[in-house]
UniProtKB/Swiss-Prot annotation:
Organism: Drosophila yakuba
CDD domains, A to Z: PAS
Disulfide bonds: none
Subunit structure: Forms a heterodimer with timeless (TIM); the complex then translocates into the nucleus.
Chain intervals with Low complexity compositional bias: 16-47, 217-232, 1076-1092, 1142-1161
InterPro entries reported in the protein's UniProt record: PAS, PAS-like_dom_sf, PAS_fold, Period_circadian_regulator
Domain of life of the source: Eukaryota
Keywords: Biological rhythms, Cytoplasm, Nucleus, Phosphoprotein, Repeat
Comp. bias (Basic and acidic residues): 129-139, 147-164, 1193-1208
Bias type Basic residues, positions: 66-79
Motif mapping: Nuclear localization signal: 66-79
Pfam families: PAS (PF00989), PAS_11 (PF14598)
Name by which UniProt lists this protein: Period circadian protein
C-alpha cells in the first residue's frame, strides 16, 4: 500500500498514504471479493488535518457514470489528504458503490454534514421513516462507520481516505444510505470509532444476508489493494440479474434498500422504490395475500428470537412493472399498467439497536425488517402445442367434495399461468373443457370407488384444462382421495397433474381474451347437469365392502406385526453376550417356547450352534427365576391347622451317652439299646422331636461322637433364629481314620457381629454382571442337558403330568424365610481324589460334623466331607439350635457301614432316638436307590398299606477286607466291643451315630414333594410318576433294615436292604402332619425300630430335604421303615450314571432328586421345588404322594450321585 499506486476503478483516486499510525486498531480493512457496499468506519486523524474528529463524509456515487467527474473528486481528495503530512505513498480510494445500477435519476446535492455526531441505527430508521432526506450526510456517515467495522485487520490508509472522502462527499449525491463503498483501510489514530464499529455489526450482517438471499448477485466491489484485481471494464460487463432484493421497514412498510438488479427485472431506477411503500407495487388482487403472509410471518420471527435464521416463507404475487421512457416511450399516461408474476421469499430480520463488545444484537422487536427476495416466474412452454416429456414436473391441486379448489402448488403457476390465490375458492369444474365433462364424470366415479380403499390412487385419461391466457393444456392426472373414517364422506380429492401437451400460446401470463366461446343452450344445460351430477356423486357416502375391510385389517395387522418384530429385534438385542463353551446338542426347551409365546425375537437363535448367540436378557432370566421361586414357595392351597399341642420329652430309653452340654442334652435323648427292637418303642416315636425346648437361649454346646471309622469329618455351622440371645456351638465328630473333610456355612443377619459390606455402585454392578453370567450359563446348561437325557415312555410322561398338580405343596405360614441363606446358589461340594480316598485305615463309618453356632434358635448348618476307609466320600452336616431351643447343637453323625452276615436279620437294631429337632424343616426329595441284587424283605405291600414311605438312604462304607471291622465308638453300651458286631448291631450303631449328629423327624403319611416341580423332564417320569398320587394309608410305618453288603463288590458302598414290617397300628396324634386323604397320624411300632433316624444328613445319598421337622413342635413319627427294595427310587443304572446338574445343584434328571450336598439344604435357592422349612407350630396339610413299589434300584456310584440327594 505505501508508496504504491494502482488504477483499479474509474472512481479510485491517488491519495497520500504517509500518515501511518499504530494508535488505532478499530478501522477495518476491505473484505476482498465482497459484493456489498462498503462503508468507512474510520475517522480522520490529526495528521490529516481533522484532529481525530468524526468524519461526516458520505459518498454514494451511484449516479456517477462519466469519468470526467472523477477529476474534480481526485483533486479534492488529494488536496485534503496533503494537509499536515508528507506523502510517502499513494493509495487508491474507491468511493463508488458496488451496487450501482444504471440510473436515470439526476444527482441530488447533498447537504454539508461536517462535524455531525454519530447516531444510532434506531435514529437512522426513524429519520427515514419521518421523511427526512435520505441523502443527509449524517445518516450515511453513520452507516459507513458501521459497515467499515466488519473486517478483521486495520490499515492506516483510512485516515487519508477519510480526509479525502469528507470533501468529496459534499459534491456527490447519496441516494441510498446503505450503499457506499469503503475506501482502502488504513491504520488511523481514530477517536470515537468504537461506536460505529459495534453498530455496524448488525447491519453489515444484514446487508450480507440481503445479497446472499436473492438469486441476483452484483459484481464485486472495485479492487482494493491486496484484495481483488477487478479491472475497470468489469463494471460495463455486469450481467443482468433475474431477481432482486429489497429491505422494508416493518414499522410503516417503507422500502429502505433495493439491489440494483431491480432495474434489470422491473425496469425501475434503483432508488425509485426508496421511501415508498412496497405494497404500492403489488397487484390489487394480491395485496391481501401479501398482507396475510406478513401477519403470519411476524409472530414466527418474534418467537424465534432476535435473529431468526432462514425463516423464509414463499408465495407468489404480481408486481408492477416500470413505465419509463425506455420501455414505453412517450405517452406513459395512456399505457396500461403491466404486472409480472414473482415468487417472493420473505425473511424477517431485526435491525441492531444496541452495540455490545461481543457483537451480540439485542432487540425488542421495534425495528423489525423484512427482506424480500423476488424471483420472476417464467412460462414453462417455449413453443406452441409443445409435447412435454414424462419427466416434466408435477403440480398438485386439491379440491373439496363440492369441487371448490382449496390448495394449489406454486409449481402450477408456470404451467397454468394462475397464481395460487387466483384458483383457490373457485370451482374446478369451470376449468374443465366442456367436451371433457363426460370423461371427468367417469373419472370421479372411479375416484369414489377407489375411495373405498384408503390411499388408493389411479391415473385417468388425459383431459383439457383452461389456463390463464384462455388456452387449454392437456393434463395427465393421478387421483387420490381422502374419506372421513367416521362419517364415510369424501373430504377432498387431490390431483397430481402433469402437462402432457402445452397451449397454443406460450405465454401463459397473458391476459385472456374477453370473447367467450359460444355454446348452445342445450349444450350449456347438459354441461351444467353433468357438473351437478359430479358434485352429487362426490357428496355420497363412500361404502366399504366387508371383504375390503377385512383385507385391510388383515394387511395392517400383518404390517404391524412385521414392524413390531423388527422393532423388538432392534430393541431387545442388547450388548449382553456371554461366551459359553460350545455344546454339541443345543435344543429348545418347551418351557422357553411357552414362556416367550413363540414370538420371541430370540426364538430363532435358540437352535444356533454359535457360542456367541444372543441369549435371553437378564430380565427374562430373572423373571423365570422369580417364577421358580414363587412356585417353590408352595403357595397356601389348604387351610392351616391350629398350633399343635406340645408334649414333654420322654424319658431316655437307652444308655445312649451324649457329649453335649446341658442345653444340648435334649438332642441326644432317646434309647440306644444293645440290639433289641423294643428300644424303639411307640412311645418314644410318638414324642420324637416334639420336645418343647426350654433350655437357656443363647448358650452354646458342643457334642462329640466317636466311632471306629477311619474317616474324619469336621464342620461348623452358623445360623440365625428368632431368639434374643446369641449362642455358639461347635460339633465335632472324630474317627480314627486319616481322611478329613470340612465345610462351613455362614449366615447373614442375626445378632452376630458381622461387619456388613458397604454397598457401592461398583459392587452392585459387579454383582449384576456376575449374576447375568451365572444365569445365562445356567440357562445354556439347562437347554443343553435335554440332549443327553434318556426319554421315558409316553405313559410315564402322562402320569407325571397327571400327578404334577398335587406335587405343589402347601406353603407353611410358620416357616422360616431363611433370609440369610434362602437365595444363595447351591454349592456343589466336590473334593479331589486325594480327599475322597483319604482313608486308608481299617473299616469304619464316616463321622459327619455338626454343630450350629449362632443366635438362639438359629439354624446354621455345617456340612463336612470325610473319607471312608475304602476311599469313598461321605458327607455329614451339623445344624444350629431350633427356635426357642439351645443356641447351638452339635453331634457326631456318621454313616456306618454294617458288616457281618451276608443276609440281614429281620430284627431291628438299637439307635438313639432324638426327641428334639434341630434341623430346619425342609421337604424331602425321595431318592433312595436300592441295589437290584438284594432281596427285599417286604412284610407289607405299599399298595395295600396305602402309605408312600418317606425313604431315607443310608450309604454305608464298606471295607474291602473283612466283616471283622471294629464297631463304632459310640458313647454307647457296645462301644469298644472287639467282637464282630452283627448286621443289626452295626446298623443300630450307624443309626445311633447318625441320630446323634443329625436328629431328624419324619412324618408318617406324608410324601414330600419332588424337588423340581416347575419343570420335570420326561426322563424323570418313571421315578416321579407315582410320587404325586395321594393315597390313603392305614398301615404303620415299617422299620428300615440295612442288610449286610457283599465285601469287595463295586456296589458295596451305599447299598442298603430295606425291609418293611407290617404296620401295627394307626393313631391320630394331634398336631402331626397328616395326609390329605387320611389325616391320621401314623405311629411307628416298636418293631419298626430306630432305623428311622439313622440316616439324617448322611453322605450324598441322603435326601437332604428330609429334615421335615420343625423346631419345638408337634410329635411327628418317623416313617423310615416303610421302604422296601421295590420302591421306584432313583435309578442309578450305569446308563443313567451321568447326570446333568445345573449350577444350583439341580439335576434335571428327576430320578435322584439330584441336588447338591446336605449343605445346600440350607442355602435354598429358587430352583428347588421344595419350600422353606415348616415350623411344627404351624403345620399344614400335606398331600400324600404314593409311589408304586417297583423299579427300585441301588446307587451304583455314590461318588457320581453325590449331588443327587440334596435339597434343591
Amino acid at each position: 500500500m505505501e508508496g504504491g499506486e494502482s488504477a483499479e476503478s474509474t472512481h479510485n483516486t491517488k491519495v497520500s498514504d504517509s500518515a501511518y499510525s499504530n494508535s488505532c486498531s478499530n478501522s477495518q480493512s476491505q473484505r476482498s471479493g465482497s459484493s456489498k457496499s462498503r462503508l468507512s468506519g474510520s475517522h480522520s486523524s490529526g495528521s490529516s488535518g481533522y484532529g481525530g474528529k468524526p468524519s461526516t463524509q458520505a459518498s454514494s456515487s451511484d449516479m456517477i457514470i462519466k469519468r470526467n467527474k472523477d477529476k474534480s473528486r481526485k483533486k479534492k481528495k488529494n488536496k485534503g489528504a496533503g494537509q499536515g503530512a508528507g506523502q510517502a505513498g499513494q493509495s487508491l480510494i474507491s468511493a463508488s458503490t458496488s451496487l450501482e445500477g444504471g440510473a436515470e435519476e439526476k444527482p441530488r446535492p447533498s447537504g454539508s454534514g461536517c462535524g455531525v455526531e454519530q447516531q444510532s441505527c434506531r435514529e437512522l430508521l426513524q429519520d427515514q421513516q419521518h421523511g427526512e432526506d435520505h441523502s443527509e450526510p449524517k445518516a450515511t456517515e453513520q452507516l459507513q462507520q458501521e459497515e467499515g467495522d466488519r473486517s478483521g485487520s486495520e490499515s492506516e490508509a483510512e485516515r487519508v481516505e477519510n480526509a479525502a472522502k469528507s470533501e468529496a462527499a459534499q459534491s456527490f449525491p447519496i441516494p441510498s444510505p446503505l450503499s457506499v463503498t469503503i475506501v482502502p483501510p488504513s491504520m488511523g489514530g481514530c477517536a470515537g470509532v468504537g461506536h460505529a464499529a459495534s453498530l455496524d455489526s448488525g447491519l453489515a450482517k444484514l446487508d450480507k444476508t440481503w445479497e446472499a438471499g436473492g438469486p441476483g448477485k452484483v459484481e464485486p466491489v472495485p479492487g482494493v489493494p491486496g484484495t481483488a484485481a477487478a479491472g475497470t471494464g468489469q463494471r460495463g460487463e455486469r450481467l443482468k440479474e433475474e431477481s432482486f432484493c429489497c429491505v422494508i421497514s416493518m414499522h410503516d412498510g417503507i422500502v429502505l434498500y433495493t439491489t440494483p438488479s431491480i432495474t434489470d427485472v422491473l425496469g425501475y431506477p434503483r432508488d425509485m422504490w426508496l421511501g415508498r411503500s412496497f405494497i404500492d407495487f403489488v397487484h390489487l388482487k394480491d395485496r391481501a395475500t401479501f398482507a396475510s403472509q406478513i401477519t403470519t410471518g411476524i409472530p414466527i420471527a418474534e418467537s424465534r428470537g432476535s435473529v431468526p435464521k432462514d425463516t423464509k416463507s414463499t408465495f407468489c404475487v404480481m408486481l408492477r412493472r416500470y413505465r419509463g421512457l425506455k420501455s414505453g416511450g412517450f405517452g406513459v399516461i395512456g399505457r396500461p399498467v403491466s404486472y409480472e408474476p414473482f415468487r417472493l421469499g420473505l425473511t424477517f430480520r431485526e435491525a441492531p439497536e444496541e452495540a455490545r463488545p461481543d457483537n451480540y444484537m439485542v432487540s425488542n422487536g421495534t425495528n423489525m425488517l423484512l427482506v424480500i427476495c423476488a424471483t420472476p416466474i417464467k412460462s414453462s412452454y417455449k413453443i406452441p402445442d409443445e409435447i412435454l416429456s414424462q419427466k416434466s414436473p408435477k403440480f398438485a391441486i386439491r379440491h373439496t367434495a363440492t369441487g371448490i379448489i382449496s390448495h394449489v402448488d406454486s409449481a402450477a403457476v408456470s404451467a397454468l399461468g394462475y397464481l395460487p390465490q387466483d384458483l383457490i375458492g373457485r370451482s374446478i369444474m369451470d376449468f374443465y373443457h366442456q367436451e371433457d365433462l363426460s370423461v371427468m364424470k367417469e373419472t370421479y366415479e372411479m375416484v369414489m370407488k377407489k375411495g373405498q380403499t384408503a390411499g388408493a390412487s389411479f391415473c385417468s385419461k388425459p383431459y383439457r384444462f383452461l389456463i390463464q391466457n384462455g388456452c387449454y393444456v392437456l393434463l395427465e392426472t393421478e387421483w387420490t382421495s381422502f374419506v372421513n373414517p367416521w362419517s364415510r364422506k369424501l373430504e377432498f380429492v387431490v390431483g397430481h397433474h402433469r402437462v402432457f401437451q402445452g397451449p397454443k400460446s406460450c405465454n401463459v401470463f397473458e391476459a385472456a381474451p374477453t370473447c367467450k366461446l359460444k355454446m348452445s343452450e342445450e349444450a350449456q344445460s347438459r354441461n351444467t347437469r353433468i357438473k351437478e351430477d359430479i358434485v352429487k356423486r362426490l357428496a355420497e357416502t363412500v361404502s366399504r365392502p366387508s371383504d375390503t375391510v377385512k383385507q385391510e385389517v388383515s394387511r395392517r395387522c400383518q404390517a404391524l406385526a412385521s414392524f413390531m418384530e423388527t422393532l423388538m429385534d432392534e430393541v431387545s438385542r442388547a450388548d449382553l453376550k456371554l461366551e459359553l463353551p460350545h455344546e454339541n446338542e443345543l435344543t429348545v426347551s418347551e418351557r422357553d417356547s411357552v414362556m416367550l409365546g413363540e414370538i420371541s425375537p430370540h426364538h430363532d437363535y435358540y437352535d444356533s450352534k454359535s457360542s456367541t448367540e444372543t441369549p435371553p436378557s437378564y430380565n427374562q432370566l430373572n423373571y423365570n427365576e422369580n417364577l421358580l421361586r414363587f412356585f417353590n414357595s408352595k403357595p397356601v392351597t389348604a387351610p392351616a391347622e391350629l398350633d399343635p399341642p406340645k408334649t414333654e420329652p420322654p424319658e431316655p430309653r437307652g444308655t445312649c451317652v451324649s457329649g453335649a452340654s446341658g442345653p444340648m442334652s435334649p438332642v441326644h435323648e432317646g434309647s440306644g439299646g444293645s440290639g433289641s427292637s423294643g428300644n424303639f418303642t411307640t412311645a418314644s416315636n410318638i414324642h420324637m422331636s416334639s420336645v418343647t425346648n426350654t433350655s437357656i437361649a443363647g448358650t452354646g454346646g458342643t457334642g462329640t461322637g466317636t466311632g471306629t471309622g477311619t474317616g474324619t469329618g469336621t464342620g461348623t455351622g452358623t445360623g440365625t433364629g428368632t431368639g434374643t440371645g446369641t449362642g455358639t456351638g461347635t460339633g465335632n465328630g472324630t474317627n480314627s481314620g486319616t481322611g478329613t473333610g470340612s465345610a462351613s456355612s455362614n449366615y447373614r443377619g442375626g445378632s452376630v457381629a458381622i461387619q456388613p459390606v458397604t454397598l457401592t455402585e461398583a459392587l452392585l454392578n459387579k454383582h449384576n454382571d456376575e449374576m447375568e453370567k451365572f444365569m445365562l450359563k445356567k440357562h445354556r446348561e439347562s437347554r443343553g442337558r435335554s440332549g443327553e437325557k434318556s426319554k421315558k415312555s409316553a405313559t410315564d410322561t402322562l402320569k407325571m403330568l397327571e400327578y404334577s398338580g398335587p406335587g405343589h405343596g402347601i406353603k407353611r405360614g410358620g416357616s422360616h424365610s431363611w433370609e440369610g441363606e434362602a437365595n444363595k446358589p447351591k454349592q456343589q461340594l466336590t473334593l479331589g481324589t486325594d480327599a475322597i480316598k483319604g482313608v486308608v485305615g481299617g473299616s469304619g463309618g464316616v463321622v459327619g460334623t455338626g454343630g450350629g453356632a449362632g443366635v438362639a434358635g438359629g439354624g446354621g448348618t455345617g456340612t463336612g466331607l470325610a473319607g471312608t476307609s475304602d476311599g469313598r466320600l461321605t458327607m455329614s452336616s451339623g445344624a444350629g439350635g431350633v427356635v426357642g431351643g439351645p443356641g447351638g447343637a452339635a453331634a457326631a453323625a456318621g454313616v456306618i457301614s454294617s458288616v457281618g452276615s451276608s443276609m440281614p436279620g429281620p430284627s431291628s437294631y438299637p439307635t438313639c432316638t432324638q426327641n428334639i429337632n434341630l434341623w430346619p424343616p425342609f421337604s424331602v426329595g425321595i431318592t433312595p436307590p436300592v441295589h437290584s441284587t438284594h432281596t427285599a424283605m417286604a412284610q407289607s405291600s405299599f399298595s395295600s398299606a396305602g402309605l408312600f414311605p418317606t425313604f431315607y438312604y443310608i450309604p454305608a462304607s464298606l471295607t474291602p477286607t473283612s466283616p471283622t471291622r471294629s464297631p463304632r465308638m459310640h458313647k454307647h453300651p457296645h462301644k469298644g466291643g472287639p467282637e464282630m458286631p452283627t448286621t443289626s448291631q452295626q446298623a443300630a450303631a450307624a443309626a445311633a451315630q447318625a441320630a446323634q449328629a443329625m436328629p431328624l423327624q419324619y412324618m408318617a403319611g406324608v410324601m414330600y414333594p419332588h424337588p423340581s416341580l416347575f419343570y420335570t423332564h420326561p426322563a424323570a417320569a418313571a421315578a416321579t410318576a407315582m410320587m404325586y398320587q395321594p393315597m390313603p394309608f392305614t398301615g404303620m410305618t415299617n422299620a428300615l433294615q440295612i442288610p449286610e453288603r457283599p465285601l469287595g463288590s463295586q456296589s458295596a458302598y451305599n447299598k442298603s436292604m430295606y425291609t418293611t414290617t407290617p404296620p401295627s397300628m394307626a393313631k391320630k396324634v394331634p398336631g402331626a402332619f397328616h395326609s390329605v386323604t387320611t389325616p391320621s397320624q401314623v405311629q411307628r411300632s416298636s418293631s419298626q425300630s430306630a432305623s428311622v433316624n439313622a440316616e439324617p444328613g448322611c453322605s450324598a445319598s441322603v435326601s437332604d430335604p428330609c429334615k421335615k421337622e420343625a423346631p419345638g413342635s408337634s410329635p411327628i413319627p418317623s416313617v423310615m421303615g416303610d421302604y422296601n427294595s421295590e420302591l421306584p427310587c432313583s435309578s442309578s443304572n450305569p446308563a443313567n450314571n451321568k447326570k446333568y446338574t445345573d449350577s444350583n445343584g439341580n439335576s434335571d434328571d428327576m430320578d435322584g432328586s439330584s441336588f447338591s450336598s446336605f449343605y445346600s439344604s440350607f442355602i435354598k435357592t429358587t430352583d428347588g421345588s421344595e419350600s422353606p422349612p415348616d415350623i411344627e407350630k404351624d403345620p399344614k396339610h400335606r398331600k400324600l404322594k404314593s409311589m408304586s413299589p417297583s423299579d427300585s434300584k441301588i446307587m451304583e456310584h455314590p461318588e457320581e450321585d453325590q449331588t443327587q440327594h440334596g435339597d434343591g
